[in-house]
UniProtKB/Swiss-Prot annotation:
Compositional bias (Low complexity): 1-14
Protein's recorded name: Coordinator of PRMT5 and differentiation stimulator
Main location group: nucleus
Localisation: Nucleus
Acidic residues compositional bias, start-end: 78-89
GO biological process: chromatin remodeling; muscle organ development
Length: 184
């Protein structure tokens, strides 16, 4: 019988204990994994800075020889298992070697500077005149104008409503003598 159950019986409690006893109730010392706040973060910061430097130089992978945060590699902590064939030191096809350099980045001065005035002067031979531009602007403000049918139109509600899920078949009722003159 554990401590909680014995205490419940001694006090005459009608409610039995639920679940396993807490570690603090057993008097056991907390596990080392429980104390996250006491860890030294300076080694983590150095590893992070090294990794950022490698990435800035163009290296896409971090070598496996530097353990991250004490035991094991960073990839093992994240839940990725390293294959034994991949950890033989050879570069995979997607990894870059240390000597490979990235192409040089463009400097801000190399970027194209737009000069709108010169572009407007160059477009003087534009086939679209101000009337075309004004008409397109009016269609943007009223989008139904371009979709509206031209000419005499009869209202058709099927354009504005989805078709029914159950087809409706009207039963035609003929009056006697309605089509007598059609036979002649």
């Amino acid at each position: 019988m554990d401590l909680q159950a014995a205490g419940a019986q001694a006090q005459g409690a009608a409610e039995p204990s639920r679940g396993p006893p807490l570690p603090s109730a057993r008097g056991a010392p907390p596990s080392p994994e429980a104390g996250f706040a006491t860890a030294d973060h300076s080694s983590q910061e150095r590893e992070t800075e090294k990794a950022m430097d490698r990435l800035a130089r163009g290296t896409q992978s971090i070598p496996n020889d530097s353990p991250a945060r004490g035991e094991g590699t960073h990839s093992e902590e994240e839940g990725f298992a390293m294959d034994e064939e991949d950890s033989d030191g050879e570069l995979n096809t997607w990894e870059l070697s240390e000597g490979t350099n990235c192409p040089p980045k463009e400097q801000p001065g190399d970027l194209f500077n737009e000069d709108w005035d010169s572009e407007l002067k160059a477009d003087q031979g534009n086939p679209y005149d101000a009337d075309d531009i004004q008409e397109s602007i009016s269609q943007e403000l009223k989008p139904w104008v371009c979709c509206a049918p031209q000419g005499d139109m009869i209202y058709d509600p099927s354009w504005h409503h989805p078709p029914p899920l159950i087809p409706y078949y009207s039963k035609m009722v003929f009056e006697t003598g309605q089509f007598d003159d059609a036979e002649d």
